[in-house]
């Protein structure tokens, strides 16, 4: 009996362990290092951290100057994600520095950064590495037309309209009419970096400067060029989000009412900060906008398996399964702008794929050109991971027995040849049998 019980227990334990490993493979480890300026931030930003924990993230909280900090051990990353809520740090503790963090991003890690007007050099340098330039220390975004009614007088408690958000629901969530509260430092994007995303910009009347000084020089950021929140998706699909405001993620801003100081402005009982912060965290930590390639098939129409080599002008069918991560599960992706290219150095065929159930497929005729080709799907859309699939095939010319017996375009030449033969035959008959009569006759 004991043996049977122990055997059953072992099977159950193995089943639970395998199920947990499968779930972990789908959701990712979710191990996240959170670096704080001080431990109090864990309490003042508890709603945001609680939402991450409820979604399965394993959060490790440490102060940014902890001497035991480490991102890499024995060549392996110890965490999947990094949260930097330590804007004023001047030197990270342990073996973490800007070079380590950039290596973490190059290795596929995701980073969420929150700055403030008291920004230190490490965050400024990290921003420069990612194509983001922060304004000087002690500066703030100022807007004399779009500030909250509770602003103390510096006009730095900005009310950002949802119209200033990036038009990408995958990144910023569903459209809403609730404005966002912002108090912090301004940023500008490197115009030579095409990977930077302007997630939330200031209004046309905003600028970044010292709030306690008269303006004596042109501000660092002005109008729509003033970035409040910026993002980056690297070419390896690693994601980084920079917020110029640490207060943006705070409980106080999540639960605050908001109303512009302008006469007749509408009052909202709650800001849109919490919804936007949750959407941003889902995107930056790859809970949203993640695509993958499933089964890829190609074969001549009417057959089910690919040949060793296709023949020019064959009618072929190509199919690909594309899935998206949603709620921790892979579900069929719904897109109407996915293209297939048939490439030999340059594309010879470019056509849209049509969705057929959970699969995208298309039929097309191969070009009358032989060589080594690729079926290529290169899908790169705002907010989604870069999707790439390439399948190499050979295309050969027609065999000798595959050519047409008579080519329609050559009919005039056939007619001239046969007419010449017929004319020669008639001429021969006439010449041989139609002799002139002799005089004796």
Swiss-Prot record:
Residues 432-441 are cytoplasmic. Pathway: Protein modification; protein glycosylation. GO terms for cellular component: oligosaccharyltransferase complex. Its main location: endoplasmic reticulum. Residues 29-410 are lumenal. Pfam families: OST48_MD (PF23358), OST48_N (PF03345). Keywords: Endoplasmic reticulum, Membrane, Signal, Transmembrane, Transmembrane helix. It is a single-pass type I membrane protein. Component of the oligosaccharyltransferase (OST) complex. PANTHER family: DOLICHYL-DIPHOSPHOOLIGOSACCHARIDE--PROTEIN GLYCOSYLTRANSFERASE 48 KDA SUBUNIT. Belongs to the DDOST 48 kDa subunit family. This is Dolichyl-diphosphooligosaccharide--protein glycosyltransferase 48 kDa subunit. It comes from Danio rerio.
